From Swiss-Prot:
Pfam families in alphabetical order: PH (PF00169)
Keywords tagged on the record: Endosome, Membrane
Protein name: Pleckstrin homology domain-containing family B member 2
UniProt xrefs under CDD domains: PH_evt (cd13265)
Cited PROSITE patterns: PH_DOMAIN
Length: 222
């Protein structure tokens, strides 16, 4: 930063209303700082013109104040602050008063410093990463307890073989076992085929016929 304007000004004290000579420095960032003397060791006060100052009065515009002895009111200026405080000053001459007025007015209306500060805050807000989440969301198959499927029939299915050897898949109703319960296993039911009784009937008929013929021959002899 650099000085925009520096010099001596008379300042009226707040309580005793006495005029005191102070050294003033106006910085390029808009800060007006005044000291006890030119050595700048003891700071009396400071005003951030773009933020704290709401008006600047000069000459006859100044209110409730009388110039110091030997000075006219045209050499006076007042800095009206936002918090209600008014800083009453008196320059060495009328030209010096106007020079301070224009310089302070430019510093008050210049919002480049404030805008850059706001822009920096917005940039940091936008570029900030989202909050870190330590726990990942569970996968759908973990949430519902279903494992990978690679068989020919879905889990919990009955395979029934009919008498003719045909296989049928029948859904199996099983109670819910919870999120981590045991998964149902495939069940295979094989029904035995019924024996073909046609061959037994034929053998029985042949045996009956042979028995009848033997008995007939026996009765014929007698």
């Amino acid at each position: 930063m650099a000085f925009v304007k520096s010099g001596w000004l008379l300042r009226q004290s707040t309580i005793l209303k006495r005029w005191k000579k102070n050294w003033f420095d106006l910085w390029s960032d808009g800060h007006l700082i005044y000291y006890d003397d030119q050595t700048r060791q003891n700071i009396e006060d400071k005003v951030h013109m773009p933020v704290d100052c709401i008006n600047i009065r000069t000459g006859q515009e100044c209110r409730d104040i009388q110039p110091p002895d030997g000075k006219s009111k045209d050499c006076m200026l007042q800095i009206v602050c936002r918090d209600g405080k008014t800083i009453s000053l008196c320059a060495e001459s009328t030209d010096d008063c106007l020079a301070w007025k224009f310089t302070l007015q430019d510093s008050r209306t210049n919002t480049a410093y404030v805008g850059s500060a706001v822009m920096t805050d917005e940039t940091s807000m936008v570029s900030s990463p989202p909050p870190y989440t330590a726990y990942a969301a569970p996968a759908p198959e973990q949430a519902y307890g279903y494992g990978p499927y690679g068989g020919a029939y879905p889990p919990g299915t009955q395979v029934v073989y009919a008498a003719n050897g045909q296989a049928y898949a029948v859904p199996y109703q099983y109670p819910y076992a919870g999120l981590y319960g045991q998964q149902p296993a495939n069940q295979v039911i094989i029904r035995e085929r019924y024996r073909d009784n046609d061959s037994d009937l034929a053998l029985g008929m042949l045996a009956g016929a042979a028995t009848g013929m033997a008995l007939g021959s026996l009765f014929w002899v007698f």
